[in-house]
Amino acid sequence: MPGKANAVKAGDDLVKEVIKIATKLGLETKEQFHVARRIWGANRNIDVILIDPKSRKTLGVECKFQGGGGSAEEKIPATIQDIDAWPIPGLVVFAGEGFTANMKSFLISTGKAVELDELEPWLRLFFGLPLD
């Protein structure tokens, strides 16, 4: 899937691309699903919920885009921690040239994050879908 991350120019585009990949795989999607509160009290909305219509297996996806310097990278550790409080498994999907090599390494090392270009095979494994 080379080139998909290059097509993403903003966070909303990343959400749309995640939904596009999930739909292609036959998964149901829900956007901005409200579930309780974050560790500091703010409302918690999961960017995208993916549901296998057959097994009902569910995955929450947080989408993080950073095109240049900015705050998305600084918020990642809190996002990873917040996923632990979700009532379902969760994953951070990230894209953009603004993530440093160190942050990419950190994200991948958590086992809770994947670059957009690697999302489809990851979802195939998670949901037990055919491996193409």
Q: For each of these PLM feature ranges, what is it?
A:
Residues V35, F65, E120:
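Active-site-proximal loop/turn and secondary-structure-junction residues that shape catalytic pockets
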Residues D12-K16, N43, I76-I80:
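Short amphipathic alpha-helical segment that frequently serves as the phosphate-/nucleotide-binding helix
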Residues E28-S55, G70:
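Active-site metal-binding core of divalent-cation-utilizing nuclease and nuclease-like domains
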Residues T58-L59, K64-T110:
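Catalytic cores of nucleic-acid endonucleases
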Residues M1-R37:
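Acidic-basic catalytic patches of nuclease active cores, encompassing PD-(D/E)XK
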Residues T23-L27, P87, G111:
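Glycine-centered loop/turn motif at secondary-structure junctions
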Residues T29, G90, A113-E115:
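Hydrophobic beta-strand scaffold residues
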Residues K9, F94-D132:
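Domain-level recognition of nuclease-like catalytic cores that cleave nucleotide substrates
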